[in-house]
């Protein structure tokens, strides 16, 4: 059985699209079952594997979730980390964690996407000629 059914995957994809509507920022969601290393190291590995560091403004954000190990991380590229408050990712993670604790993985991810999108549009508003540089599909990994 798939981790997310088609409806849940579509809900996450639409949340990514909505979050990116008013920003040049690029957001991806990466899901795998287990994380066999430090969660931030694992997220950074997939950040690069998914070419998120190649965006025009270096404003990619990755939400990484290891479902079985119950670990997750949010990382942003250099352009974002220069302008967001130091606790930005921590406060976003806390909001997501409230949903995760209730067993609602999809709602937690959607919450993270909404918050990331709101903040990104403040620092990286959508401009003329901005394009969707990265796929909005969920990246399902299997310990790659």
Predicted regions and their residues:
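A structural boundary signal for the start of the first folded domain, especially the loop/turn
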Residues: 1-144
